[in-house]
């Protein structure tokens, strides 16, 4: 077993060797290096064919028509294109948007930008388990609501929203529904031929494909229109200009093909490992599960260890690659906004760790992690005056701390 152990698959995944091998064939002179938009020679035709195959592989995983898949530079761009693109196109109908407080920053900051441009955004607070209350969502819908953006799987706590029901609610009112499916695609079944979802964002690098490539699903029936955010040669049916990066697209296609084949067995395996990890730590004192095991993605476990500083815990667990919060916001020392939105105290949010498992995680690694966590928590709590006071029965919430 090699240390450190990678348990941060929700931040990124290693590229599957099968994917890397495939990508190598689309880079050099002796490979297929042409521009898929070059229509006048074989180099272009071969590149275009490779892109078509990948587009099909992505569409097949999610039950879409390949013509509904638009390539982007990643899920952040897909979120921007979906939300700004739909808001700008449909603003004559209304300027009200609904999202949730626990969305990814790529959705929240895009909505904030639209607010600066004169749109009105309602940010729903989830219930304490992270699930959106559908009655609250319904109450927030108005005649001038044009767009709802609620994610499938939360990247920090792994809870799964009921996108099927939300889609029905939106379709009944003629509201466009966007789903950020970055953390769910290839892990949970998605069938866009059944779901009433109009726009869906995908990433390559969360599912063993390369970084820097993603896609946006744009429904054809009923037809959804979006305004392009990047202008140029009119690639991707005018929705996203720019020369297509064939090697990245082929890599994403291969990753999605593998995911379709292996998803069922892989998810059962990961669910077992995640439960093994939780069962290994849940009997410790003052340990809390954030999110919901029943309504949770099989590969994410977010746990708070009370009376232990999250930063010191991460240092103590240096042999485990884990995160507090998400990689996108872990550079700031603020407690996770997702956990705060669940109504958690700053202290508890600060002591939370996200473990995310993946294709190369083994049972041996999980057992090593459990042992390390138990030892580290014990040691850090011995050093903690707060833990000592708590053990003596002092109510820490009632103490007036002096601010120096």
Swiss-Prot record:
GO terms for biological process: [2Fe-2S] cluster assembly. Pyridoxal 5'-phosphate binds at residues 75-76, 155, 183, 203-205, 243. It catalyses: (sulfur carrier)-H + L-cysteine = (sulfur carrier)-SH + L-alanine. Keywords: 2Fe-2S, Cytoplasm, Iron, Iron-sulfur, Metal-binding, Pyridoxal phosphate, Transferase. One of its GO terms (molecular function) is 2 iron, 2 sulfur cluster binding. It is found in: Cytoplasm. Pathway: Cofactor biosynthesis; iron-sulfur cluster biosynthesis. [2Fe-2S] cluster binds at residue 328. It is an enzyme of class 2 (transferase). Its main location: cytoplasm. The active site is at residue 328. GO terms for cellular component: L-cysteine desulfurase complex. Its cofactor is pyridoxal 5'-phosphate. Pfam families: Aminotran_5. Signal peptide: none annotated. The keyword Cytoplasm applies. InterPro entries: Aminotrans_V_dom, Aminotrans_V_PyrdxlP_BS, Cys_deSase_IscS, Cysteine_dSase, PyrdxlP-dep_Trfase, PyrdxlP-dep_Trfase_major, PyrdxlP-dep_Trfase_small. It comes from the Bacteria. Its EC number is 2.8.1.7. The modification N6-(pyridoxal phosphate)lysine is found at residue 206. Homodimer. Forms a heterotetramer with IscU, interacts with other sulfur acceptors. Belongs to the class-V pyridoxal-phosphate-dependent aminotransferase family. NifS/IscS subfamily. Master enzyme that delivers sulfur to a number of partners involved in Fe-S cluster assembly, tRNA modification or cofactor biosynthesis. Catalyzes the removal of elemental sulfur atoms from cysteine to produce alanine. Functions as a sulfur delivery protein for Fe-S cluster synthesis onto IscU, an Fe-S scaffold assembly protein, as well as other S acceptor proteins. This is Cysteine desulfurase IscS. It comes from Klebsiella pneumoniae subsp. pneumoniae (strain ATCC 700721 / MGH 78578). The gene is iscS.
